Amino acid sequence: MSAKEIVQEFYKSDALLENETVSRLLHDDVVLEWHSSKGFLKLNRQEIMNITTELAKAYIRSKIRITHILEEENTVSVRYSHYVKTIENPREEMLLAHFMVIWELKNDKLYKGYQMSQL
């Protein structure tokens, strides 16, 4: 798979709720630097996996709507909106946030991420 295809696999519908999928696509030494509306986070592999677990507990569906995706060698940039459906209200789709992320891949896995998000 190309770097772009690997990133698309990571953001396909419901993938962020699936520990197995996320784990398979993350490099062992992955680091995600995330600037959110709540502040700065620097996440390692286990912390990213913990977020996946928490998302799976809170939401029954996760949908990523990618508006832009660009690939240059082992680097992929993605602009997307993340929508979810809650267990309490499965018919209503809610916007979680808008995201822009640049992923560097190593050995066909997500290695370094630089992400910004805003609700």
Which residue ranges define each predicted feature?
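Short acidic-aromatic low-complexity motifs
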Residues: 1-25
